[in-house]
């Protein structure tokens, strides 16, 4: 697929940028060389501390992956010159002290480009974040922001994806209201050729858009996603952060409310706190 895109990009005056996300198990020297040649960015899935990561990231035999993947991640990052990558983790109800996971990746493992996302799970899941978790999460985001400032002053900065904010040259207004563009200008392609609005919808027949041979055949669904923006969500009307989140994630809204035009209020609270910290910094 990448080779095909490279073969036609000059002909069509395009500049394709590829990102690969990996759990690390299949990384080899050959994979590292390919990533350095073809990938603008590489996303490396690691949830932080060994006990946190190995709670969910296990193989078919139930064995944790931490000890196998960390050396591979370190080798890949070194080969990329410490650039063009992100360590991407997920925190759950079991590790609301997620700054410990970020600091472990930075201080113990040597990674500086970091991202940590709140879990998206059914409310009755043991992993789901709760209202009682929110004050702890808010404290964690403030702790992270202050520690990043300390590191910056010490000349050893780290990057946290969700604190990257450009107040002078931000996204155009279209991106500010429509976000990722799932279902219209952004789609997930499965290994068997089916098209979905994004990876979160893969496997749900109600959200299959078409396939790579016939193109988008479910035009009604495409048109529904076309209207999925911040102005389609009444709850966003009075939110000060609405043009930073573009109404939020359609998949999160669907999981929380049953409607892609709904509002995942818990996620809104977390997002606003992240924006407060980013603006403070």
Put a short name on every predicted segment:
Residues 192-194, 206, 231-281:
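Radical SAM enzyme core and accessory elements
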Residues 135-169, 199-246:
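C-terminal accessory region of radical SAM enzymes
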Residues 171-177:
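Short, flexible cytosolic linker that couples an ABC transmembrane/permease module to its adjacent nucleotide-binding
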Residues 180-183:
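Short, small/polar residue-rich loop motifs at catalytic or cofactor-binding pockets
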Residues 1, 22, 26-28, 51-52, ...:
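Flexible loop/turn segments at secondary-structure boundaries
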Residues 51-56, 113-135, 157-171, 200-206:
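Flexible glycine/acidic-rich beta-alpha junction loops that bind and position SAM and/or redox cofactors
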Residues 1-119:
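Radical SAM/AdoMet-radical enzyme domain recognition
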């Amino acid at each position: 697929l990448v080779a095909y895109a490279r073969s036609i990009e000059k002909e069509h005056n395009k500049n394709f940028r590829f990102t690969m996300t990996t759990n690390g198990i299949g990384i080899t020297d050959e994979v590292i060389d390919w990533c350095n040649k073809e990938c603008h960015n590489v996303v490396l899935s690691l949830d932080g501390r060994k006990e946190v990561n190995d709670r969910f990231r296990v193989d078919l035999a139930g064995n944790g992956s931490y000890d196998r993947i960390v050396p591979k991640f370190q080798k890949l990052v070194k080969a990329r010159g410490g650039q063009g990558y992100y360590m991407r983790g997920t925190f759950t109800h079991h590790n609301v002290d997620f700054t410990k996971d970020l600091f472990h990746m930075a201080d113990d493992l040597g990674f500086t480009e970091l991202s940590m996302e709140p879990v998206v799970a059914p409310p009755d899941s043991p992993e789901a974040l709760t209202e009682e978790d929110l004050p702890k999460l808010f404290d964690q985001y403030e702790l992270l922001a202050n520690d990043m400032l300390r590191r910056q002053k010490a000349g050893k900065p780290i990057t946290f994806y969700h604190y990257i904010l450009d107040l002078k040259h931000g996204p155009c207004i279209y991106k500010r209201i429509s976000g990722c563009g799932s279902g219209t200008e952004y789609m997930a392609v499965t290994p068997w050729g089916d098209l979905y609005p994004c990876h979160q919808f893969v496997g749900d027949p109600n959200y299959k858009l078409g396939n790579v041979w016939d193109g988008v055949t479910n035009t009604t669904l495409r048109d529904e996603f076309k209207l999925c923006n911040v102005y389609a969500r009444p709850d966003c009307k009075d939110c000060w952060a609405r043009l930073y989140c573009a109404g939020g994630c359609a998949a999160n809204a669907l999981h929380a409310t049953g409607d892609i035009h709904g509002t995942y209020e818990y996620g809104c609270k977390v997002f606003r706190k992240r924006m407060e910290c980013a603006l403070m910094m």
